[in-house]
From Swiss-Prot:
The chain crosses the membrane at residues 161-181, 192-212, 224-244, 256-276, 411-431, 438-458, 748-767, 771-790. It is a multi-pass membrane protein. Mg(2+) binds at D690, D694. The keyword Lyase does not apply. It is an enzyme of class 7 (translocase). It catalyses: Cu(+)(in) + ATP + H2O = Cu(+)(out) + ADP + phosphate + H(+). This is Copper-exporting P-type ATPase. GO terms for molecular function: ATP binding; ATP hydrolysis activity; copper ion binding; P-type divalent copper transporter activity; P-type monovalent copper transporter activity. Cu(+) 1 binds at C16, C19. InterPro entries: ATPase_P-typ_cyto_dom_N (IPR023299), ATPase_P-typ_P_site (IPR018303), ATPase_P-typ_TM_dom_sf (IPR023298), ATPase_P-typ_transduc_dom_A_sf (IPR008250), HAD-like_sf (IPR036412), HAD_sf (IPR023214), Heavy-metal-associated_CS (IPR017969), HMA_Cu_ion-bd (IPR006122).
Length: 802
């Protein structure tokens, strides 16, 4: 091969020589490819013709065979981006680099997330490439206080704005002369006075625009800095030209536009300051999550209690937590009992009772007892750290709805410069032939009114605020893509056990005396069956003392038989009683039928061959399940239940909560196929489950929603995780998605509408440059401000007919 490139890929999933041979054979079947796969190093070295192939093709081939290619992810902090054209250009350049699988750049967070192949490139190369484009970049430091960094940057912007405003304010007086025919001191109209004030604004305060424009143009791009630099420079240097004419006596009334250039820069800085201030508020939800973390822990060392920083706690350390203190890390209680406020995770305000061997979650509040615990998860592995990670990823991700804005942003500035040039030509040749000033003013107005910033901020700011607000309510979206897809859902499939129900059987009905219950619980206490556990717990709640069984025998399909303290015990169904010649009174038979119809497991109890009781056990429906399903129906969403239980039990549960569609007798591996059937009917389906035995169905659904327990926030199969198991959060998640997408559409409508309307108005000469500059400055502020309205949204779904 004359023109060749070589790449090395890390391969995962190979177990033997057959694997490596299979991959090598498949790659070598491609034209102009020479591949060698080493099982020991788990690497594939591929020589290829870059005109015919790219690395992604080899990766797809390997993945199609069922193997993986190792990918690393790095997050980068980027400074110097001023508008969507900047972020769009950086993203485009990164995605063209060898070894980069995918790169996204977020203008709002000023961060990039890059997935890359470590054998092809590394984080330092990514940083260097961004720096060559004229921006500052560094690998994100998770230990660095991002809030204080942004506060410092905001303070710097404010200082520049104040200096610029002080210098521009006297020049602003000249505009009032033109507008209102006011009388002002002669000093204000003196060209030297205007020059002295405008020059530092143009070349010191406004130098950032020249630097940004130069860096972008040098790299073949154009951004907002180009528009500002060209527009203000045109006004400034035309004023210099007029001033020179005044100095050499060619004119006594120079037409100066120093106030235009200086006031434009001040207004744009004002807009950027307001924008940065508003953007800083979009990350409040993340800041609040970070503030929940404990700062230190009380560790037990050599019998002494010592306070240490949280980052020095290791797995296995013994910690002591006193009343009123936060649980420092995730762990297990080894001594003591208490009640813990877990509302930061579950939203449930009632403290949860905790005893020895119970799990405790870091950053929750210990209310009333001193406990000793063992650390099981620390640092980035804790539940709160996982929540923060999910929220960060969601806030830095892109929604598909942003693509159009990204495409337009890439061409926006060159098009605007072209329109400004055309405006100048039309004015100087057709509108006011031979008159320079009106043509200049109109073209400057076109340059400064155009705003690519609003386009770039329209989607990410809404995603940031929307996902942050959802996280505050225990709803974790894994990314912007899932926020967008969720609003399209028209069908929700709920797994029964652990989703609609509590997943823990309890005694719902009992008819009999305490002695019968005591004997029943004693007979069941050694069984590991969940129903037996429910009966034993019920007896303990009644404070009954359990003894020991003398004999025990399971009767397959019918029940159990036992001897306790010389009493013969039978527990089971009708058949067991009939086989032992025990007759059922009509009211007992009716109760049995009633319980079975309600989906409960009913058992008859006979002591010494005489019927003495009946007990019913069922997995109870969660609080608010019925209300949640009613809300989904009110939103026009179809709700179905999927379960492996028999149809009678399933129908009984469905009836309790108001579900019409029941899919019963389904094996776990068949759940995904049921989702596919619904999708084939043209439905957009969300699957709700616990992420364990229904993971394939969660993946298959358009949106997978996992019910987390607080410690399981990163369930891989899920697109959304609901903390705490409250089903009311499902309609809230859908409403949050709808509200966020509605907000994005409002922002995009404003951003597009503003430019579509504003540029022609400016080109017609109907706007003074300073008015156009003010409009441009406020346009991006209005987009961010509109997104911030989501911070106050009440997650209460609307009826479809409302």
């Amino acid at each position: 091969m004359a023109n060749t490139k070589k790449t090395t890929l890390d391969i995962t999933g190979m177990t033997c020589a057959a694997c490596s041979n299979r991959i090598e054979k498949k790659l070598n079947k491609l034209d102009d490819v020479n591949a060698q796969v080493n099982l020991t190093t788990e690497k594939a070295t591929v020589e290829y013709n870059p005109d015919r192939h790219d690395v992604q093709e080899f990766i797809n081939t390997i993945q199609h065979l069922g193997y993986g290619v190792a990918v690393e992810t790095v997050e980068l902090d980027i400074t110097g981006m001023t508008c969507a054209a900047c972020s769009s250009r950086i993203e485009k350049v990164l995605n063209k680099m060898d070894g980069v699988q995918n790169a996204t750049v977020n203008l709002t967070t000023e961060q990039a997330k890059v997935d890359y192949y470590p054998e092809e490139t590394d984080a330092d190369k990514l940083v260097t490439r961004i720096q060559k484009l004229g921006y500052d970049a560094s690998i994100k430091d998770n230990n660095r206080d991002q809030t204080s960094r942004k506060a410092e940057a905001l303070q710097h912007k404010l200082i520049k704005l104040i200096i610029s405003a002080v210098l521009s304010l006297p020049l602003l007086m000249l505009m009032f002369v033109h507008l209102f025919n006011m009388h002002i001191p002669a000093l204000f109209t003196n060209p030297w006075f205007q020059f002295i004030l405008a020059t530092p604004v143009q070349f010191i305060i406004g130098w950032q625009f020249y630097v940004g424009a130069y860096k972008n143009l040098r790299n073949g791009g154009a951004n907002m800095d180009v528009l500002v630099a060209v527009g203000t420079s045109a006004a400034y240097f035309y004023s210099i030209y007029e001033m020179v004419r005044w100095l050499n006596g060619s004119t006594t009334q120079p037409h100066l536009y120093f106030e235009t250039s200086a006031v434009l820069i001040t207004l744009i800085l004002f807009g950027k300051y307001l924008e940065a201030r508003a953007k800083s508020q979009t990350t409040n939800a993340l800041g609040e999550l970070l503030s929940l973390q404990a700062k230190e822990a009380r560790i037990l060392k050599d019998g002494n209690e010592v306070m240490i920083p949280l980052n020095e706690v290791h797995v296995g350390d013994t910690l002591i937590v006193k009343p009123g203190e936060k649980i420092p890390v995730d762990g297990k209680i080894i001594k003591g009992m208490t009640a813990i406020d877990e509302s930061m995770l579950t939203g449930e305000s009632i403290p949860v009772e905790k005893n020895v061997d119970d799990t405790v979650i870091g950053s929750t509040m210990n209310k009333n007892g001193t406990i000793t615990m063992t650390a099981t998860k620390v640092g980035g592995d804790t539940a709160l750290a996982n929540i923060i990670k999910v929220v960060e990823e969601a806030q830095s991700s892109k929604a598909p709805i942003q693509r159009l804005a990204d495409i337009i942003s890439g061409y926006f500035v060159p098009i605007v410069v072209g329109i400004a040039l055309l405006t100048f030509i039309v004015w100087i040749t057709l509108v006011t032939p031979g008159t320079f000033e009106p043509a200049l003013v109109a073209s400057i107005s076109v340059l400064v009114i155009a705003c690519p910033c609003a386009l770039g901020l329209a989607t990410p700011t809404s995603i940031m605020v929307g996902t942050g607000r959802a996280a505050e309510n225990g709803i974790l979206f894994k990314g912007g893509e899932f926020v967008e897809r969720t609003h399209q859902i028209d069908t929700i499939v709920l797994d029964k056990t652990g989703t609609i129900t509590n997943g823990c059987p309890v005694v719902t009905d009992y008819h009999g005396d305490d002695q019968t219950l005591q004997l029943l619980a004693t007979a069941e206490k050694d069984s590991e069956h969940p129903l037996a556990e429910a009966i034993v717990n019920y007896a303990k709640e009644k404070q009954l003392t359990l003894t020991e069984t003398t004999t025990f025998k399971a009767v397959p399909g019918h029940g159990i038989e036992a001897t306790i303290d010389h009493h013969h015990i039978l527990v089971g169904n009708r058949k067991l009683m009939a086989d032992n010649d025990i007759s059922l009174p009509k009211h007992i038979s009716d109760d049995l039928t009633h319980y079975e119809r309600d989906g409960k497991t009913a058992m008859l109890i006979a002591v010494n061959y005489s019927l003495t009781g009946i007990i019913a056990v069922a997995d109870t429906v969660k609080d608010h399940a019925k209300d949640a399903i009613k809300q989904l129906h009110d939103m026009g969403i179809e709700v179905a239940m999927l379960t492996g239980d028999n149809k009678n039990t399933a129908q009984a549960i469905a009836k309790q909560v108001g579900i019409d569609t029941v899919i019963a007798d389904i094996l776990p591996e068949e759940k995904a196929a049921q989702i596919t059937k619904l999708q084939q009917q043209g439905k957009k389906v969300a699957m709700v489950g616990d992420g364990v035995n229904d993971a394939p169905a969660l993946v298959k659904a358009d949106i997978g929603i996992a019910i987390g327990t607080g410690t399981e926030v990163a369930i891989e199969a899920a697109d959304i995780t609901i903390l705490g198991g409250d089903l009311m959060l499902i309609p809230k998640a859908i409403y949050a998605s709808k509200a966020t997408i509605r907000n994005i559409r409002q922002n995009l409508f404003w951003a597009f509408g503003y430019n579509i309307a504003g540029i022609p108005i400016a080109a017609l000469g109907l706007l003074a440059p300073w008015v156009a500059g003010a409009a441009m400055a406020l346009s991006s502020v209005s987009v961010v401000t509109n997104a911030l309205r989501l911070k106050k949204m009440r997650l209460e779904p609307r009826r479809k007919d409302a």
